[in-house]
Design a protein with these regions (language model features):
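P-loop NTPase catalytic cores that bind/hydrolyze ATP
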Residues: 150-185
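Intrinsically disordered, low-complexity acidic Ser/Thr-rich regulatory segments
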Residues: 28-35, 137-159
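Conserved P-loop NTPase motor cores
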Residues: 1-139, 172-174, 178-188
């Protein structure tokens, strides 16, 4: 993993270009950063091979034509190399996706804080009303308006295979992603 990080840094350096003089076509248009599609980079279980100095990668990736995904099970693994580096990586990643969560502390705090609060209304009480058809509860005519957390730890822990909470800017999307679960073959050739 650490060798891959070193190679990626070298690729990003090369994407800056070698010449600073010449025609626009020679200096700017020939750079790999002019591609219509970014170079996709997925760093799965990043925390286990994190190295100091990696925090600049997501900060510079977009301008160099790279799309970087830092994936892991928990935030403390990202912090093994450096807490400051982990915080910088989190801050420079625009989209945050939380699938099934098992760390109710540090990792949950990150997603809870990122999701923020929303103004919600709720009925303050109900009344028992009886009539010709029997009795039933009817909401009172008063409501309470307050800021509440947009996600809670149970939401994240109870997610099934492929389910996720996706945070982008101020948007929170509860979604279902592709989950490959092919049947096991009877025979293998």
């Amino acid at each position: 993993g650490k060798i891959i990080i070193a190679c990626l840094k070298q690729m990003m350096g090369a994407a800056l270009g070698a010449s600073i003089e010449g025609t626009y076509a020679d200096v700017v248009d020939t750079k790999p950063t002019t591609s219509k599609m970014p170079f996709m980079t997925i760093l799965d279980e990043y925390g286990y091979y994190a190295v100091k100095g990696s925090a600049v990668m997501p900060a510079q990736a977009r301008s160099l034509g790279f799309s970087m995904i830092f994936a892991g099970q928990d935030l403390p693994a990202f912090e093994k190399a450096s807490k400051e580096e982990a915080a910088s990586i989190v801050a420079n990643c625009n989209i945050k996706i939380c699938m099934k969560l098992e760390d109710p502390d540090t990792t949950y705090a990150l997603f809870e804080k990122s999701a923020g609060e929303a103004l919600t209304s709720s009925v303050t009480s109900v009344e028992l009303q009886s009539g010709m058809m029997g009795a039933g509860y009817v909401p009172n005519r008063s409501a309470n308006v307050a800021f509440n957390k947009r996600i809670n730890v149970r939401d994240l822990k109870d997610q099934g295979a492929g389910e996720a909470h996706i945070l982008f800017k101020s948007s929170l999307v509860r979604g279902k992603m592709f989950y490959a679960n092919p049947p096991k073959p009877q025979y293998i050739r």
